[in-house]
Amino acid sequence: MSQEKYGVLMVNLGTPEAPTPRAVKRYLAEFLSDKRVVDTPRALWLPLLYGAILPLRSPRVAKLYQSVWMDEGSPLLVYSRRQQQALAASLPDVAVELAMSYGQPALPQAIARLLAQDITRLVILPLYPQYSCSTSAAIWDAVARILTGYRRLPSISFIRDYAAHPAYIAALAASVERAFTRHGRPDRLIISFHGIPQRYAEEGDDYPQRCDVTLQALAAALDYPPEQVMMTFQSRFGRDPWLLPATDETMKSLPSAGVQHVQVICPGFAADCLETLEEIQVQNREIFEHAGGSTFHYIPALNDDAAHVDLLHQLVTAALRPSAPPPAVVSLASF
């Protein structure tokens, strides 16, 4: 009889514990100190970060968080916790933990809780549909560092990404079609992904290609002219060139091209957060309308939708199948 004990570690980026300047400063300091996120030499970056960026940005960003904060807390944490609870309910014999790369719930404690249950197989599920060195790889780095403190390790499966998984594409397509039914068919469907510095892509990060994989699969799944689907990149930070076209610049230019109705979906975000609820739904709406556009709708993230939970269930069960790579190896899966 098998003595296997399974565990799942779901990981998302992170969020401040409160919408206050102090909490935001603490969160941003941890996030922006990660070399996977900003790889500027530490001697140059850290004085700039602590001397200028954190003091200036923290109060402003705290106000933005206040505008989207839910009764239960940060939207990212609220929806991620619901995802964890729903996935755990669908996998009654599997220990399911949630962690954030930065902030709470913290990775070291989540891993400690899993290993305390003597699990023999661990699935690490980054909640990033498209791999990037600044997100998925940062989780790999952090988990590896934490595990150096343990003598006994389980076999580990790391889900690299799921950019083209059929259940993921189907869930996105259903979400878009619901929006079309509710708001009508737009002149353009904007698929906005979080951006990364262009240099990261030039140095080998295949994130742009993984975004394009999702774009092409989603466009093919929709009953909508593919030429009216546009991919853009948001959330630029710093002065380095980032992936183009930029979402905000696209919003400025569309009305002059005769586009009056846009709908925007952000498939790289597994849960709604500041970047979707404030940057897209508020800021980019204002940009579009100020430029002369008339109708703007944001299509929510998949969050804890049943189809999304089913996708997560499929990802985990595939990684735990007996046909998966045998114990004693670390496997990397991309769907």
Curated annotation (Swiss-Prot):
Predominant place of localization: cytoplasm
Origin superkingdom: Bacteria
A molecular function GO annotation: ferrochelatase activity
Job of this protein: Catalyzes the ferrous insertion into protoporphyrin IX.
Subcellular location field: Cytoplasm
InterPro entries membership: Ferrochelatase (IPR001015), Ferrochelatase_AS (IPR019772), Ferrochelatase_C (IPR033644), Ferrochelatase_N (IPR033659)
UniProt-annotated binding residues for Fe cation: 194, 275
TM region(s), chain numbering: none
Enzyme Commission identifier(s): 4.98.1.1
GO annotation, biological process: heme biosynthetic process
Family membership: Belongs to the ferrochelatase family.
The keyword Cytoplasm is annotated on this UniProt entry: yes
Gene: hemH
Pfam families: Ferrochelatase
Gene Ontology cellular-component terms listed: cytoplasm
Keyword terms: Cytoplasm, Heme biosynthesis, Iron, Lyase, Metal-binding, Porphyrin biosynthesis
Record protein name field: Ferrochelatase
